[in-house]
A protein has these predicted regions:
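A short helix->beta-strand "capping" segment at the edge of beta-propeller domains
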Residues: 118-137, 168-174
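Short, compositionally biased P/S/T/A/G/V-rich stretches that sit at domain boundaries
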Residues: 18-49
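Conserved beta-strand positions in repeat-built beta-propeller and related beta-rich domains
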Residues: 153-157, 197-202, 236-240, 281-285, ...
Length: 351
């Protein structure tokens, strides 16, 4: 009986091994489904300048009925396998397109990815100091903006992050609220009757009323660096070249911009400020501000802010950060992390 059982088990084992081998061979020899169409041009990550015409070429083993190109929610229909396309929106950076090829009963989709550089060379700009004012040397500045005549500043560092209303002339803090110790505060801005403040890596933002009373929180999937207001949209930087466009009502992301010059992308975008319809951004660890077209992402000017920290003495002062614009008086103020001074400046052409 024991011998018969061993024979039966051996037989079943051989069957199982053969079945696994056949299944493995079948999977290995299974032909990969081959596409009937191929996107020949443009190549992936092909580089263009805004305004360039992009040449598309499709190869197909069967006659093509039509080709539909989709970009930013708009569709364009072509009847030939080779056609030219020009982006109407004119946004810099990586642009993702969808190309659907229709051949009789068959449809196949391709996702070309191309890069647009700016079509303008940024102007070189400098600055002139118009006024030197006091600034709290313990403030690790991350955000700076005006609420009418009141200067509002958000600061960083865990356990030290706060949002404060400040007297512009004396640097006296006359109203302030602190974040919980687990949060590293970042940029801040105002939209209508609400103030928005980011945190660095906690993926959490805070909404306050005009008296700095917290009303609610919101979340976002990326790091939070700088934030400013452009009409009914919040523009948020995350330390890369990407700017996130956020609806302040429901905090949904309604778009993105990638910031490019005519030669390269601009990384480390930090504190943001809108000045007369143009976006200005500090570049982290550089003594530079870039001005940006908020609709296209292209850099319009590079402002050299070097030498500003030579105007004070401090062993603790860190990176230049913070731009505030008083729209009524057309005044621009800048400072830095742990700086003892706030400067009113004017941007001027640089030879």
């Amino acid at each position: 009986m024991k011998s018969a059982t061993l024979v039966l088990l051996s037989f079943l084992f051989l069957i199982a091994c053969n079945s696994e081998k056949e299944a493995g061979d079948a999977a290995q020899n299974s032909p990969r489904i081959k596409k009937q169409t191929r996107l020949v041009s443009p190549k992936i990550n092909a580089e263009y300048v805004l305004g360039d015409v992009v040449a598309f070429k499709i190869e197909s083993e069967t006659p093509v009925d039509s080709i539909v190109l989709e970009y930013e929610g708009k569709e364009s229909v072509y009847l030939e396998k080779e056609f030219d396309w020009k982006a109407e929106l004119g946004k810099t950076g990586i642009q993702k397109l969808k190309v659907s090829v229709y051949c009789q009963d068959l449809s196949e989709t391709h996702y070309p990815k191309i890069i647009f550089f700016s079509d303008v060379t940024p102007t070189k700009t400098g600055y002139q100091v118009l006024q030197t004012l006091p600034h709290d040397p313990t403030a690790y500045t991350q955000g700076l903006f005006f609420m009418e005549d009141t200067l509002v500043e958000s600061t960083g560092q865990k356990g030290e992050s706060r949002l404060s209303k400040i007297n512009l002339k004396t640097a006296q803090v006359y109203s302030s609220t602190s974040l919980a110790s687990q949060y590293f505060g970042e940029g801040s801005t105002i939209w209508k009757d609400q103030i928005y403040q980011l945190t660095w890596t906690s993926h959490t933002g805070f909404v306050y009323d005009l008296n700095l009373k917290q009303k609610q929180t919101f979340s976002y999937p990326h790091e939070g660096w700088g934030i400013t207001t452009f009409g009914d949209t919040l523009i948020v930087s995350d330390g890369t070249e990407t700017l996130h466009l956020i609806d302040p009502r429901d905090f949904s992301e309604v778009g993105k911009l990638e910031v490019y010059t005519d030669k390269s992308k601009v990384m480390n975008l930090n504190e943001l400020e809108m000045i007369d319809g143009i976006l200005y951004a500090n570049v982290w660890l550089e003594e530079v501000i870039v001005s940006i077209d908020p609709k296209s992402g292209k850099v319009l000017s590079v402002i050299d802010m070097s030498g500003l920290d030579d105007r004070f003495e401090s062993d603790d002062a860190e990176a230049y950060n913070g731009i505030a614009y008083h729209a009524g008086r057309k005044e621009i103020y800048v400072t830095g992390k742990l700086w003892p001074n706030l400067f009113q400046v004017k941007f001027i052409p640089k030879n």
